[in-house]
């Protein structure tokens, strides 16, 4: 969902918080795997249903999620869920449920947006493709359209689904209010933290893109002698670059010991492969360099949850043998490559302070990610850090971090 959020809001910001589960009237869960992969979230939803009377509407692929307790379960093929949401958006527009005032004040709508939506997502076409009757689908849409506080839970990997969900919430004004927001679930506990510090190939650190201004600011902040000038490679593109010789060295940081097939192929093909991993892999003995790192329960640092909550992760067990933190390993590799001055870190708190200061650097309010309050944090204070959420209630005044202050509806395929 990172690309969709950046395109719609102007910044990769999650509008929701877990407290919105209790504040909502209706939770629309898209995909049964969300309940299975996020048991704490599932327990929270169950408590909200029992204590607050929150309704749960589950959109699940045929045969999936049959054991999930929901007020209503709708079977829709996985590859048609984005179309189902787009049909809901068109129905809201055609029946006058979209928030015209909110759209006029706070959202830019492409000239042909509604025309394109009308030709591709009419009630009958969506019903036929999803295996539902038009009468049944209209009743479902009517039921959802009149609920003012809706939280939509969805997986962030499907960009088409993310665009449809975000468009629905923007067009109906169900955003920037307690209990009303799109909520993309991250696959990893620190998924948002990784995006904030620039681990996605599509952006720079601290929610900066590859604009000339952003690159100049980061170059000054880091006193960088060389800076990336455009998005990097990801997934299959990275494997292709290894095969054709554009990439000669690869550093892999693995936390669960399970590398995807494309990464294993890349590590086998690259001349220099370095793996920071807590797991021994007999199949890879003698192939590349393996550096022992901390497993999840041995890690020590901060992480950012899906709802912008920064919390302190403390090591449960001492590091065994020669194992070191991943950040320390990256620092040593960088120093060995000749970048000693840029990688001077000796403590995890130093990295946190630098990240905090970078979010505030040249930030006059154009970006919501601003951790300025922690810029002077000391090492002892870092050790005692308690959870805190940045961004308060994003977009509550209808303003977005775009040049004109307006969000954007995203064209749907």
Regions found by a protein language model. Name each.
Residues 1-396, 405:
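Cofactor-pocket helix-loop regions in the catalytic cores of large enzyme subunits
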């Amino acid at each position: 969902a990172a690309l969709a959020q950046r395109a719609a809001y102007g910044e990769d910001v999650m509008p929701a918080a877990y407290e919105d589960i209790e504040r909502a009237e209706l939770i629309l869960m898209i995909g049964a795997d969300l309940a299975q992969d996020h048991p704490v979230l599932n327990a929270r939803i169950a408590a909200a249903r029992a204590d607050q009377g929150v309704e749960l509407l589950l959109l699940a692929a045929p045969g999936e999620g049959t054991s999930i307790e929901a007020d209503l379960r709708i079977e829709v093929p996985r590859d048609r869920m984005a179309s189902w949401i787009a049909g809901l958006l068109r129905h809201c527009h055609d029946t006058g449920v979209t928030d015209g005032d909110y759209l006029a004040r706070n959202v830019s709508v492409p000239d042909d947006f509604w025309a394109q939506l009308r030709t591709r997502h009419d009630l009958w076409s969506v019903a036929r493709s999803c295996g539902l009757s038009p009468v049944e689908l209209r009743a479902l849409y009517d039921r959802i359209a009149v609920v003012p506080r809706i939280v939509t839970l969805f997986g962030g990997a499907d960009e088409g689904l993310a665009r449809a969900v975000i468009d629905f919430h923007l067009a109906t004004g169900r955003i920037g209010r307690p209990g009303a927001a799109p909520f993309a679930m991250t696959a990893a506990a620190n998924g948002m933290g990784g995006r904030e510090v620039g681990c996605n190939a599509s952006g720079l650190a601290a929610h900066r893109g590859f604009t000339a201004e952003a690159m100049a600011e980061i170059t000054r902040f880091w006193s960088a002698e060389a800076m990336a000038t455009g998005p990097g490679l990801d997934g299959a593109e990275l494997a292709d670059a290894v095969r054709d010789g554009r990439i000669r060295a690869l550093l892999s940081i693995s936390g669960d010991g399970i590398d995807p097939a494309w990464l294993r192929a890349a590590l086998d093909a690259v001349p220099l492969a370095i793996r920071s991993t807590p797991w021994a892999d007999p199949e890879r003995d003698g192939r590349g360099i393996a550096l022992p790192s901390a497993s999840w329960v041995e890690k020590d640092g901060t992480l950012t949850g899906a709802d912008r909550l920064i919390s302190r992760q403390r090591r449960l067990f001492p590091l065994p043998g020669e194992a070191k933190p991943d950040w320390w390993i990256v620092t040593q590799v960088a120093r060995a490559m000749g970048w000693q001055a840029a990688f001077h870190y000796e403590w995890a708190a130093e990295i946190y302070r630098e990240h905090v200061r970078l979010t505030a650097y040249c930030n006059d309010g154009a970006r919501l990610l601003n951790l300025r309050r922690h810029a002077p944090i000391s090492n002892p204070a870092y050790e005692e850090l308690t959870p805190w959420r940045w961004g308060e209630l994003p977009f509550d005044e209808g303003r977005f971090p775009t040049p004109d202050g307006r969000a954007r509806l995203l064209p749907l395929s």
